[in-house]
């Protein structure tokens, strides 16, 4: 996502080899990362968190001011599109559930032009219902044409929404597999280090 330079390999974006010097470079190329901590401010409103420094303005020149009405309308509409009813967009984000906050962060990234979403453990701290809401939105985002990279240790969340899987073990790739070639049980065994355990027996 631009924070670290790769030790090896290449990053190809739309057929061109690309080097990111910062997260801003990645964002400019349409690659957005939603981190596990979400980068949300609990005491700020839903709208303020949605725009976070990119608020719509009204007026001219030095007399520009934050267009609160437009911002509230956009935030409510975008959240509504994913099935989350924000009755009052001025409410503090801290009053929302974990799943709603996760969807807010993802919806924000998409609104600002993300072509590829990198999601870092988006369901790790969520209950069953909240996790299902987030996973449904991930499927919806992927179906709309976005590229989605879901980073998770939970095979029960990864398998239903994934098309291909890259398995990492201690920082090394164990391979990339298409869903049609890999059962849920096989994926679970590889993630749990099952193949290494088999070699010890």
Where in the sequence are the language-model features?
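Glycine-rich phosphate-binding loops of nucleotide-dependent enzymes
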Residues: 1-201
